[in-house]
Curated annotation (Swiss-Prot):
NCBIfam families listed in its UniProt record: psaA
A Pfam family matched in the record: PsaA_PsaB
EC number: 1.97.1.12
Gene name tied to this protein: psaA
Native organism: Huperzia lucidula
Name under which the protein is recorded: Photosystem I P700 chlorophyll a apoprotein A1
GO biological process, one term: photosynthesis
Single annotated GO MF: magnesium ion binding
Amino acid sequence: MTIRSPEPEVKIAVERDPVKTSFEKWAQPGHFSRTLAKGPSTTTWIWNLHADAHDFDSHTNDLEEISRKVFSAHFGQLAIIFIWLSGMYFHGARFSNHEAWLSDPTHVKPSAQVVWPIVGQEILNGDVGGGFQGIQITSGFFQIWRASGITSELQLYSTAIGGLIFAALMLFAGWFHYHKAAPKLTWFQDVESMLNHHLAGLLGLGSLSWAGHQVHVSLPINQLLDAGVDAKEIPLPHEFILNRDLMTQLYPSFAKGLTPFFTLNWSEYSDFSTFRGGLNPVTGGLWLTDTVHHHLAIAVLFLIAGHMYRTNWGIGHSLKEILEAHKGPFTGEGHKGLYEIFTTSWHAQLALNLAMLGSLTIVVAHHMYSMPPYPYLATDYGTQLSLFTHHMWIGGFLVVGAAAHAAIFMVRDYDPTTQYNNLLDRVLRHRDAIVSHLNWACIFLGFHSFGLYIHNDTMSALGRPQDMFSDTAIQLQPIFAQWVQNTHAVAPFSTAPNAAASTSLTWGGIDLVAVGGKVALLPIPLGTADFLVHHIHAFTIHVTVLILLKGVLFARSSRLIPDKANLGFRFPCDGPGRGGTCQVSAWDHVFLGLFWMYNAISVVIFHFSWKMQSDVWGSVSDQKIVTHITGGNFAQSSITINGWLRDFLWAQASQVIQSHGSSLSAYGLPFLGAHFVWAFSLMFLFSGRGYWQELIESIVWAHNKLKVAPAIQPRALSIVQGRAVGVAHYLLGGIATTWAFFLARIIAVG
């Protein structure tokens, strides 16, 4: 990879008109590659085109040009996101029962999709309440709109148009910053400036402006909605912003203006910026005054953080200095050399960001149900289940992506001559110890966690319930988890004396929040059943990590193939004549890691779905008696494999299997179709390239006989392509099957 010489003293961060705008190039598929630009001679061409179109490393060696392409592509990505968001808001304005839901969120179900009456498809439009027929949606948009103070279709239309304007701006920026004013490499490598702007601008000012919107628009509108005022009677957002008297009626401290702020009497503002904890009993969501406080605090933190790094003024932190000073007594050169890695390898940078973002997304999944941030989210069980499942899947994919790009970095960008005795080098040198120990941990966890279930199934089959691991026989209580729960539950009276309630009702206590006769949230008990399944979680996560980490650590070389780096990121085998060297490429480890990621996430979402239906979700009578959806059967049924199959998969699949002829057949058909897609994947995964090439050649012979031979020669998929198609359909089929199963079930019973 060529890295250009340093620029002269005067900083000119952009280059003018570096690449001319050419419609001819756009019209020529594969213009970025001499081989692909020639056009197809065999069917392999279309696969290579898709594989390489966005692999900018394969277009050029120039790091500056690669950086510009990535930068420009990001604007394209943002444009797509804005168009998607705009579409969501437009549907909410044009095809939804949003205003009916807003007036009665406990009885009306959200819908923003109406099926046209073609071949009888209108059966899919169920009665969602409020005199509306449509498909029930579980995306949570209605709840977000309620929280942000949107009360009318006009506001949704306006936001949708705004989204399209932003999308156009992004598309323009993507073109402008590649063709007209392209940043120089030094600009992409100026990490201190980037940190300052992203921390202070995106996160700091972003949070501050959201906090401002919440205070001046969301809070007053939500307070009036909570009090039962009709949405059409509520003043418009600009009236709250411009008319202080209007705000003073709801929040008296507004009469004092900014005086308390400058005199440091901040407690005066506690009518709209609170620290209450717990949930609003009217909506079942977090107190919006708490979330205002949260965003204000985040803004302060990040505005400070965005002024910590040294740029033109010679004060503040230098990242290179921080990294190079970061060494302990046993860690050799420590982080020396990492600065150069992260400023010259975007794969390394991306790997780090994906690992962080993936972990964060999974953290979000767990907070969405335990601290539901939007009004009426907690009692919309379909949305709760969808949001948890969605964020778990996304997090899983991002973490696997982190390993993929870490391995690409190792193969393409890692220079062993510059990395001596730093942490990366030391990790690579003792990789055998890491991988073999991790392998031992996986075997231990696998045998012991699964063994507990096998024991229970055997005892159950032999009619010996007294010898099973369960809450009523041999107890295996998760005492550490229970201790953590209890510590948080008692915090308001001990370690957090100013809080009115603990951070989440799930920790414990006696509180129960019910909205409209449905449980929003209550303390979640943990027992032997949770102890067992948590060890399955530990097992599947560790195996996923083992596969992915082995792929990264052995991406460049191994005892089996010392020169692996020369073979690239993805290759089928180490050439003919070397048996037993297939499926060792870094790409193959990502491929295998995806299957275990799928295993891991499946167990998590199954656990969540059943646990919530059994122990949390349900109806509440006037006498405060809770009736859970599956009547608390998780603790006794989920302790055997048979119980998972019988009382979860089979029992809860009845809704999707029996959905035909009703509006839920919107899930019944995809349930069948997704099973087919999943089964179809096995055809790619369980057969070799040679089989297909032989078959293709006899089919081509038949075409030749009939004088209808194609000009482009058919070729079987390469080994790697076949596995890619296989895993894509496996995951798509598996995820879509789970989606149909979950939603048909929860919409029917929730």
